[in-house]
């Protein structure tokens, strides 16, 4: 039920979502549950009476094999982590891995491999459109300028996001299941070390966001002084 832009069922939905976070029930994240680096930020957001998180990712690096038909799924991760890594993981150091193999043209049956850094993304349901618009402004001021609002009269979702990312085709999985990388091993090492810088900046933006949202929670929870008479009003003015 919606009255003047306020979703009166929000409290019930928030209670259900928070109970799910405490249990083993999967959320809307690809992993099915939040990753630990983002827990402190989630705690702050969920302490606000007008917000609740619905899905999240603190940021990650990955080496991903596309599906046979990239539009229909079927891909998988060779490596994925929510932490910075300066050293190559064992899967990329295997003696069967071939580096510096650049095909002259696309080969049918090969599946592309992508290297990616993805920044923090967070979806927050809000009690009202006004709450969503305010949260959007706060997030944008902290470096999450691609933040947007999705929703209807029944539900408002703020997608907090930023453009701090890398997405690079680096190789292929052949029809015979061989890993062939277009780049050299040295360049692969460079990508992993470069991602450390991205993780650092991503963490800085998350810290700024957490600090600003803590202030918003404090303001929201602070009791308002009731004016008892006209003299109080004149003093306030």
Swiss-Prot record:
Pathway noted in the entry: tRNA modification; wybutosine-tRNA(Phe) biosynthesis
Family membership noted in the UniProt record: Belongs to the TYW3 family.
GO molecular function, one term: tRNA methyltransferase activity
Keyword tRNA processing: yes
Protein name: tRNA wybutosine-synthesizing protein 3
Enzyme class label: transferase
A biological process term (GO) from this entry: tRNA methylation
EC number assigned by the record: 2.1.1.282
Keywords, ordered alphabetically: Methyltransferase, S-adenosyl-L-methionine, Transferase, tRNA processing
Organism from which the protein derives: Schizosaccharomyces pombe (strain 972 / ATCC 24843) (Fission yeast)
PANTHER family: TRNA WYBUTOSINE-SYNTHESIZING PROTEIN 3
Domain of life where this protein originates: Eukaryota
InterPro entries assigned: tRNA_yW-synthesising, tRNA_yW-synthesising-like_sf
Gene3D superfamilies attached to this UniProt entry: tRNA wybutosine-synthesizing-like (3.30.1960.10)
Primary role: S-adenosyl-L-methionine-dependent methyltransferase that acts as a component of the wybutosine biosynthesis pathway. Wybutosine is a hyper modified guanosine with a tricyclic base found at the 3'-position adjacent to the anticodon of eukaryotic phenylalanine tRNA.
A matching Pfam family: TYW3
Catalysed reactions listed for this entry: 4-demethyl-7-[(3S)-3-amino-3-carboxypropyl]wyosine(37) in tRNA(Phe) + S-adenosyl-L-methionine = 7-[(3S)-3-amino-3-carboxypropyl]wyosine(37) in tRNA(Phe) + S-adenosyl-L-homocysteine + H(+)
Keyword Methyltransferase: yes
Gene Ontology CC annotation, any one: cytosol
